[in-house]
């Protein structure tokens, strides 16, 4: 006989865990740049939709299809007998619950590899995680495998879900390499802020809410007083650890950086949730407090370590949240377990090193297996598909190149649609993309120059010798343009992000299959004032830097300047320009 209350509770937990996908999507989108928002939303949708059939086909069977030491069994499409699980809920309810857990492990990886991963590659490795990686690790810990038989304890997935996803996230981010512009030539990291902190915060609130289903639902039961008491403790410990971790992270960043860091504090909330997940059923509230306390410190130190020392670029902090705190939460069981629901009490509760040793053994072996398998998967993907997108795609944004989406925010293009989706044709292609081989006519067509007529200024003088050069260019060309101007000796420039209305013929971005006619396109306007340096040299350097062989590469305006005043010193004209050229 099935228990109706247990069935309902498990389904509620499953639905909450499913809704975590929305939280992850908002977090990742908010903590990254706007030009990749559509790509991130697609990834978080597709890892669940790809993982669900994969887990049904063989994943669930590998995880729960038997009690073998290494794998459960090979049971395609879940046709076998699962009575050995001893469930008092329908099998399909349990399958739904485990499916959403599998999806969570897969979606964790998305954040650390954001803004530079080939979308095809993402789909393939998401399938691999759901087919063989997560199920086999899950079998060892939850499905009757060798770790479970040794007494390894992971109530709701600090190790099985978050550590596994975090290890893959770390490996993937390391193999991909950092985003363009993340580190300078000396290895110093540069901040690349996310574009929407509100979305990131909303994602954290959603995840926190859903974690009550993630941890609380893992009891699978509310039918007895004992089950209700344990579930209540699980939910209380979950909330307490997250709250403490959040406070600690806020205070720690306040002391460390001089101001309380918002995005780091949001990560602190998630760190506390991850850390308490393994032991929420076996630690006391005092244990939960200390687990959350350490998690709040660990997430900050981990982010700094991977950013500054390891040079692993993790845009959303997924490695620090899920890997570092998944490891910590799993170890914490061996320290703070009261002995309830574990074979041995933790070290601090008189149980010695037995439980701690089992937890450490489990972490090492699981992580070793995951690293070996996913290293092979990533290498194969890189060889046959390509793991990382080309530099041009990364600079323009994955939305326009991977999905034909000019912007996730209607009316404002975040990616430069002209360069990203250009289809060479008679309207735009000038026939030569190498500036060293292009004719003057081709270069002038790609980057036209407009010069202001010299007016009479005073005393019959037509030209002061000072000029302002205003250059309108594509976002992706800024670094080349800046380098070209610096090589001439121009070090002072004003750079403005501007939006232009219109669309270049030959672009192919669409929304719901319908071509987009008009949008606001992002450009940069670079302005320099020169006197000693030849204005013609500046113009020629800019034309060569911007040229790609298409109409619309840029435009240059040259103006006469009558007077320049440096506010700080009061110097005027030529003297005022000497430290910027």
Predicted regions span which residues?
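Glycine- and aromatic-enriched membrane alpha-helices
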Residues: 1-457
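Positively charged, small/polar-rich N-terminal and surface patches that mediate targeting and assembly
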Residues: 401-405, 420-581
């Amino acid at each position: 006989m099935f228990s109706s209350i247990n069935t309902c509770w498990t389904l509620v937990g499953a639905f909450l865990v499913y809704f975590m996908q929305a939280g992850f999507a908002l977090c990742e989108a908010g903590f990254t740049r706007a030009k990749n928002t559509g790509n991130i939303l697609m990834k978080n949708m597709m890892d669940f939709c790809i993982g669900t059939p994969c887990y049904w086909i063989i994943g669930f069977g590998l995880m729960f299809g038997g009690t073998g030491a290494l794998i459960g069994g090979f049971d395609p499409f879940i046709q076998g007998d699962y009575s050995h699980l001893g469930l008092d809920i329908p099998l399909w309810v349990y399958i739904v619950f485990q499916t959403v857990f599998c999806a969570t492990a897969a979606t964790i990886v998305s954040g650390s590899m954001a803004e530079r991963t080939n979308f095809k590659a993402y789909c393939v490795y998401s399938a691999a995680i759901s087919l063989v990686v997560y199920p086999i690790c899950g079998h060892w810990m939850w499905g009757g495998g060798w770790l479970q038989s040794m007494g390894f304890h992971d109530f709701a997935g600090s190790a099985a879900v978050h550590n596994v996803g975090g290890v893959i996230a770390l490996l993937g981010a390391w193999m991909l390499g950092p985003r363009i512009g993340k580190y300078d030539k000396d290895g110093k990291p540069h901040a690349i802020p996310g574009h929407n902190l509100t979305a990131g915060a909303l994602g954290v609130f959603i995840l926190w809410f859903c974690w009550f289903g993630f941890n609380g639902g893992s009891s699978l039961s509310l039918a007895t007083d004992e089950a209700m008491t344990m579930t209540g403790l699980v939910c209380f410990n979950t909330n307490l650890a997250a709250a403490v971790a959040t406070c600690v992270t806020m205070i720690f960043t306040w002391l460390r950086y001089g101001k309380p860091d918002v995005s780091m504090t949001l990560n602190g909330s998630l760190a506390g949730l991850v850390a308490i997940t393994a032991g929420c059923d076996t630690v006391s509230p005092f244990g939960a407090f200390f687990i959350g306390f350490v998690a709040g410190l660990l997430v900050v130190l981990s982010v700094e370590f991977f950013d500054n020392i390891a040079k692993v670029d993790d845009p959303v902090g997924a490695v620090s949240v899920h890997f570092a705190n998944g490891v910590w939460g799993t170890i914490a069981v061996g320290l703070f377990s009261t002995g309830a629901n574990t074979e041995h009490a933790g070290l601090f509760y008189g149980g010695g090193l037995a439980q701690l040793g089992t937890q450490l053994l489990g972490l090492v072996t699981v992580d070793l297996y995951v690293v070996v398998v996913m290293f092979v998967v990533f290498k194969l993907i890189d060889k046959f598909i390509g793991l990382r997108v080309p530099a041009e795609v990364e600079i323009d944004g994955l939305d326009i190149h991977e999905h034909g989406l000019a912007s996730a925010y209607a009316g404002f293009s975040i990616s430069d649609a002209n360069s990203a989706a250009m289809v060479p044709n008679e309207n735009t292609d000038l026939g030569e993309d190498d500036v060293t081989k292009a004719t003057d006519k081709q270069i002038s067509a790609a980057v036209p120059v407009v010069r202001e007529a010299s007016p009479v200024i005073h005393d019959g003088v037509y030209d002061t010798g000072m000029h302002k050069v205003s250059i309108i260019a594509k976002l992706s060309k800024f670094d080349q343009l800046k380098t070209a101007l610096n090589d001439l000796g121009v070090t002072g420039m004003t750079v403005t992000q501007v939006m232009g209305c219109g669309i270049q013929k030959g672009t192919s971005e669409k929304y719901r299959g319908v071509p987009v006619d008009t949008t606001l396109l992002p450009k940069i306007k670079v302005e320099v004032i020169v006197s000693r340096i030849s204005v013609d040299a500046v113009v020629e350097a800019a034309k060569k830097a911007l040229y790609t062989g298409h109409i619309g590469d840029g435009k240059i305006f040259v103006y006469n300047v009558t007077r320049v005043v440096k506010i700080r010193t009061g110097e005027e004209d030529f003297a005022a320009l000497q430290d910027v050229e």
